[in-house]
Design a protein with these regions (language model features):
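Alpha-helical membrane-anchoring segments
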Residues: 2-539
Length: 539
C-alpha cells in the first residue's frame, strides 16, 4: 500500500475500487478463479435441471407459484423480499429456462466469453431459484456461491474475449472481498463451534461419529470412521486450529499466504472424499486460489499455455484512447465516475454487512446500524457462515412408503441418501440432491417444522411424475398407492467384523412413524389415517 496514506480521498477510492490501479499481479489467479466459478455454476444448474420441477414446479413439493402468490400480499415489497425472475412466470417452461440459460452462461464463462455478462446471467438465474425455493434453498453453499458470484461481477475483466485482461487488472477491493469471503467461511465456522457450547468440540470428540452422521456420507468415510480414536481427536483439534488460527496467514506476507493455501487445500481433500457437501468444498478451494499470485503460477505453467490463455488479450482489450470530441470526453468521464461510485458503494456495503455479522458471533447484537445488513439479506450476497456449530448425535433417515392395504408397505428408493443397508454410500459431489439433503435436516426435528415432508406425501399419493423423478424408481408403476406414510430409522455404520461377515454397510432400527399417514377419502379429499407420536424418540 505504498504512499496510500498520503493520497487524497478521491485517489484512495480509485486505488481501492478501480481496475486502472488494480492488483496487476493477480491476473492468472483471476483467470483460473473465473473458469472454476463457471464450472461450479454449471454443477449447480446441472443439478437443478433434473430436480427443479419436482421441487418447486406447478406440481412439485413446494410450488413456487403458490409461494409467490402468497407474497403478493406484501405489495411492492415482495420484489425485494423475493428477488426472482419467476415473478414473470413460474411455469415449468420458465423453470427450465432459468436452468438452461444458467447452464449456457456457465459454459461461456468457462470459455472466457464476455465474463461479466455471463456472471450476471448466472447470478440472476441462480438467485431466481434460491429466492423461490423456500425450504430447498436454506443451505450455506447457496449463499457462498451467490456472494462469490456477485463480487466477481466487479472482479472480472470487461470485454467479449478479454484473455487475462491485462489492461483491466482486478480492483483491490473486489480481490480483498473474495479473499475475505474465504477467510470468513473458515473463521466464522471456528467461532460458532466455540460459541455454541457443544461439548463435543470442547472435549475433542466431535469427529468420532462425524463421518457416519453427516448429511450424505461416502464409502471412504466408512473406512475413516474405523480409524483409531486418537486420529479423530487429532482431526478435531486440527480443525479448530486451522479455522481459528491458520487462516490468519492470509493477512501475512506473500510466503505465509502461499503456505496457507497449500495447508488448507490439503485439508479439504479428505473432507471431499469422506462427505458429499455438494459444490461447497470446491468453491472454498477455488476461493483459496486467490491467495496465490502471477509470479507463483508462472513458475508452474508452461509458456505455450500462458500464451494460449492470453492469446486474445490485445485484440479484445477495450480502447482506452480518449475520444476526440469534448462532449464525448465528458460523457466518457461521467460514465466512469458513475461506475466507480457504484462499485465503491456496493463493495463497501458488502464489507460492512459481513463484518457486522461476523462481530455478532462472539459479541452478540452490537449497537451498530443494521439496516444495511437487512437490506442485502434477500440477495444472499453478504452472508454469515458457520459450519457444524453443533455436531449431530446419531444418524436418522426418513423413508417414504406406500401401500394399497395398510399391511404391506413398499419403500420409495432414493437416488443418493442412505437407505438400503447393503448399498455402499457413494461419491457424487458437486451434484446436489436437494430433497435428500432436506430430509437429513428434517430427520433431526419434528414433522410440523418440516411440512415439505407432508407435501411430498401428498404428491406421491397423486403419483406425480415430477416428484417421482426425484426418486430412483416408483414401486407402484402407473397406479398410485392408496396410502403414503413417512417413517424414520436410526442408522449406524456396521463394524469391520459385521461388514466382513454380512457385506452390509449399515445397521438400522425402525423408530416408527415420522409424519401423518395420508390417504384419499371417499369424497376425494385428503385424510389422515394415522398420526405420529407427539415427540419422536431419539435414543
Amino acid at each position: 500500500m505504498p504512499d496510500v496514506m498520503k493520497r487524497t480521498p478521491a485517489s484512495v477510492i480509485r486505488w481501492l475500487f478501480s481496475s486502472e490501479d488494480g492488483a496487476s499481479d493477480r491476473l492468472l489467479p483471476r483467470w483460473f478463479f473465473l473458469r472454476g466459478l463457471g464450472l461450479i455454476y454449471f454443477s449447480a444448474f446441472y443439478s437443478l435441471v433434473f430436480q427443479i420441477k419436482g421441487l418447486i414446479g406447478p406440481n412439485g413439493i413446494l410450488p413456487a407459484d403458490e409461494y409467490l402468490r402468497e407474497l403478493t400480499k406484501l405489495g411492492v415489497v415482495r420484489f425485494w423480499y423475493a428477488p426472482t425472475l419467476l415473478w414473470f412466470s413460474s411455469s415449468s417452461h420458465m423453470l427450465n429456462a432459468i436452468c438452461y440459460v444458467g447452464l449456457i452462461a456457465a459454459v461461456l464463462l468457462v470459455l472466457n466469453v464476455w465474463p461479466r455478462a455471463m456472471l450476471a446471467l448466472c447470478f440472476a438465474c441462480f438467485l431466481s431459484f434460491v429466492s423461490a425455493a423456500q425450504d430447498f434453498s436454506g443451505y450455506q453453499s447457496d449463499g457462498m456461491l451467490l456472494e462469490a458470484g456477485f463480487i466477481s461481477l466487479f472482479f472480472a475483466p470487461p470485454g467479449v474475449r478479454p484473455g487475462l485482461g491485462g489492461d483491466d487488472p482486478p480492483s483491490r477491493a473486489s480481490l480483498f472481498l473474495l479473499q475475505w469471503e474465504w477467510f470468513r467461511i473458515y473463521f466464522e465456522s471456528g467461532m460458532v463451534k466455540l460459541a455454541s457450547g457443544d461439548p463435543q468440540w470442547r472435549d475433542f470428540t466431535a469427529m468420532d461419529e462425524y463421518y457416519q452422521n453427516g448429511p450424505l456420507p461416502t464409502w471412504i468415510g466408512w473406512y475413516v470412521q474405523h480409524l483409531p480414536h486418537k486420529l479423530h481427536t487429532f482431526a478435531t483439534g486440527a480443525t479448530l486450529v486451522l479455522e481459528l488460527v491458520l487462516v490468519w496467514m492470509l493477512f501475512l506476507p506473500r510466503r505465509w499466504r502461499i503456505a496457507c493455501f497449500f495447508i488448507v487445500t490439503l485439508w479439504q481433500v479428505p473432507v471431499i472424499l469422506t462427505a458429499n457437501y455438494t459444490f461447497l468444498n470446491y468453491l472454498v478451494l477455488l476461493l483459496g486460489v486467490l491467495l496465490l499470485d502471477d509470479r507463483f503460477l508462472q513458475r508452474w505453467l508452461s509458456q505455450p499455455l500462458l500464451t494460449r490463455i492470453d492469446d486474445r488479450t490485445q485484440a479484445a482489450s477495450p480502447d482506452r484512447t480518449a475520444p476526440e470530441e469534448d462532449h464525448a470526453v465528458r460523457a466518457f468521464s461521467h460514465i466512469n465516475a458513475l461506475k466507480l461510485a457504484f462499485t465503491s458503494v456496493m463493495l463497501s456495503w458488502i464489507f460492512y454487512s459481513t463484518l457486522v455479522q461476523m462481530l455478532w458471533i462472539p459479541f452478540g447484537r452490537l449497537p451498530l446500524p443494521t439496516s444495511p445488513v437487512i437490506a442485502l439479506e434477500p440477495f444472499r450476497i453478504a452472508n454469515r457462515y458457520g459450519l457444524f456449530a453443533v455436531m449431530t448425535r446419531g444418524r436418522y433417515e426418513i423413508e417414504f412408503q406406500g401401500s394399497n392395504d395398510g399391511e404391506t408397505w413398499m419403500a420409495y428408493p432414493f437416488r443418493h441418501k442412505p437407505q438400503d443397508p447393503t448399498k455402499a454410500p457413494g461419491i457424487y459431489a458437486p451434484y446436489q440432491p436437494r430433497l435428500d439433503w432436506n430430509l437429513w435436516f428434517a430427520s433431526l426435528g419434528a414433522w410440523r417444522d418440516n411440512m415439505f415432508v407432508v407435501s411430498a406425501e401428498e404428491r406421491l399419493l397423486a403419483n406425480d411424475s415430477d416428484v417421482l423423478s426425484l426418486f430412483a424408481s416408483n414401486p407402484f408403476g402407473k397406479n398410485a398407492p392408496k396410502l403414503v406414510r413417512a417413517v424414520i430409522w436410526r442408522y449406524w455404520f456396521t463394524s469391520l467384523a459385521e461388514r466382513h461377515a454380512t457385506g452390509m454397510w449399515w445397521r438400522r432400527e425402525s423408530l416408527g412413524l415420522y409424519a401423518p399417514t395420508l390417504t384419499h377419502m371417499p369424497d376425494g379429499k385428503l385424510g389422515v389415517v394415522e398420526w405420529p407420536p407427539p415427540a419422536m424418540p431419539r435414543p
